Design a protein with these regions (language model features):
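Active-site histidine-anchored catalytic micro-motif
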Residues: 27, 32, 45-47, 60-62, ...
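Conserved glycine-rich phosphate/nucleotide-binding loop
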Residues: 252-269
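Structural motif
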Residues: 2-5, 31-34, 63-66, 79-81, ...
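A short, compositionally biased
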Residues: 75-77, 190-196, 258-262
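Anionic-ligand-binding alpha/beta catalytic cores of soluble enzymes and soluble regulatory domains
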Residues: 117-183, 187-193
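Fold-independent oxyanion-binding glycine-rich loops
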Residues: 8-10, 36, 68-71, 84-85, ...
Length: 269
């Protein structure tokens, strides 16, 4: 059965999540649909990219990833169909695709939308479902739309690196109020070069040890670890790190204000 994932900013309480799945199953009852998340905050591209990127790498080859995030940032004229690292992606032309992939896709196709159609979520879902069905039935990706496509590119939020420090941004706060920073284990170790370190946040909070699990510290104590996706996480064992320390996730509005509670710095010494 064709395996599809769904990621959206619709919100779980909304009927539209069920309607989207129903629309896909009308196209092909054999579709196996897996939810990644429907709780992406509107317009939060860094969080959407993190959630999609972290989940997608765990799926088998030739999974179809349908991303219904910020579908209507501008009036939609086309959808994007991409193939990269043996995965298919279908999403709006809003820049999110290149943020998820952290590079340009191996193959990208523009799928023009019917100018006369009412461009709502159900219509766009129906187009996505038909695209998947064409691929499942053996049609070449290059025959489905136009390979001569212009599309919006946005770059993912990168940490600032120098010889003695890394400055990262909070990109996600999970349901336990653990704080995820856009610093990967690989970036951390490459910059560290075996040196000691201090992870500094909220001006005067500091951690100088990487834990393997929450249980490495006493209940109520803060810790840092690398999560299952390989990103730096700041947490409190059986506590609420984001709330206690007043930390907040990244947003474009915050970046313009350069607010300190979204920044985490690592100093090597």
């Amino acid at each position: 059965m064709p395996l599809l994932t769904l990621t959206s900013d619709i919100g779980n309480p909304d009927y539209l999540v069920g309607a989207v799945k129903a629309q896909l199953l009308q196209t092909n009852p054999e579709f196996q649909i897996i939810d990644i998340s429907h709780s992406i905050p509107p317009f939060n591209y860094p969080q959407a990219a993190y959630v999609c990127r972290s989940a997608i790498k765990n799926f088998p080859d030739f999974t179809y990833h349908l991303i219904l995030v910020n579908l209507f940032e501008k009036k939609p004229e086309q959808l994007l169909l991409a193939f990269h690292n043996n995965q298919y992606f279908i999403c709006a032309d809003n820049g999110l695709l290149t943020m998820i992939l952290e590079e340009n896709p191996e193959i990208i196709i523009g799928i023009p939308l019917d100018k006369a159609a009412i461009k709502n979520t159900i219509y766009l879902t129906s187009v996505m479902g038909k695209i998947v069905n064409q691929l499942v039935n053996g049609e070449s990706i290059k025959n489905i739309g136009s390979s001569d496509v212009q599309y919006l590119e946005k770059r993912h939020l990168r940490p600032m690196l120098d010889n003695n420090s890394i400055e990262g941004q909070i990109i996600f706060i999970d349901s336990f109020e653990n704080v995820i920073v856009n610093i990967t284990r690989e970036q951390f170790e490459e910059q560290r070069k075996g040196r000691g370190f201090r992870i500094v946040f909220k001006r005067d909070e500091m951690i100088d040890h990487i834990s393997e699990s929450y249980a490495d510290v006493r209940e109520g104590e803060k810790l840092a670890l690398f999560n299952s996706a390989g990103y730096l996480e700041i947490a409190i064992n059986k506590g609420n790190a984001a709330g206690l320390f007043g930390l907040k996730g990244f947003s474009e509005k915050m970046r313009q204000g350069q607010l300190s509670y979204q920044t985490v710095r690592v100093y090597f010494e």
